[in-house]
Amino acid sequence: MDRYVLRPNDPHLWAMYKKAVASFWTVEEVDLSTDVRHWTDKLTEAERRFMSHILAFFAMADGIVGDNLVCNFAKELDHIPEARAFYGFQVAIENIHAEMYTQLIITLVAKENQAALFSAAEDMPCVKAKAQWAAQWLNATHKPIATRLLAFAAVEGVMFSGSFAAIFWLKKRSLMPGLAFSNELISRDEGLHCDFACMLFRQMANKPCQDDAHQIISDAVDIETAFFREALKTPLLGMNSDSMKLYIQFVADRLLDALGYAKMYNVSNPFDFMDNISIEGKTNFFERRVSEYQRMGVFTPSSMEFTMNEEF
């Protein structure tokens, strides 16, 4: 019965949970009124097509991540109090992300086109490939937990990264402020989720060998690259499938390094507008207050004591 008592053992994992709580936000705090006009009057048809692909993927992606947490990780790791707390909160945050993407589609996309985006996981091949890869790991409960933790770090750390960058590209051009703001909040959340996965992974036994880890990351990179070849059939000013491929490889190397493996691609970041934004949380992106959404008092000193005696 002791596992029902929330008594943290690892101050670093617990700090991740407290950071997540401090970053809570809601869909109602995002103003999309200007975005409606920008979507119609300022984005080109090619840009709307590109963003529609991204929204179609995101509309279902958080549901798969949430299912994995509820069905697998939260149960398998419930002996670790920090993981139990973090994953419980992450499920709520993934629901907010899913709600946000639904609201974006309903608000921005013409009504006759919305159904196609909501069913993209079945009907849009490049989105379906991403969904199937993530679902494959959702159902791979015969695989070691460390291997699946790595795979879902790839989902959130690689398969989300290009789409986040695409929306930051709009922000650089002062377009779609509501979408850009929600993207800042969501990418911050997902970066924290990925950081937590990496921290937990490094403490686990029975990690996959480097060849297996490289294969998982390589598969994620290939599927993500194929997605952008389809989404970016028409090159855009400052955004094309070749530069996106380099960015995805760059992010994959950062993730491999955070997980404790050798890099695979050794490429530079092709997007100057992403230089100060690390999806893996390597900069102070999570330390600063993002538009004053960090809840006051969450990081105040606590009387709770920590011990470093947990076995992983």
UniProtKB/Swiss-Prot annotation:
Its EC number is 1.17.4.1. It is an enzyme of class 1 (oxidoreductase). One of its GO terms (biological process) is deoxyribonucleotide biosynthetic process. Keywords: Deoxyribonucleotide synthesis, Iron, Metal-binding, Oxidoreductase. It holds the Pfam family Ribonuc_red_sm. Fe cation 2 binds at E94, E156, E190, H193. The keyword Metal-binding applies. The keyword Metal-binding applies. Heterodimer of a large and a small chain. Belongs to the ribonucleoside diphosphate reductase small chain family. This is Ribonucleoside-diphosphate reductase small chain.
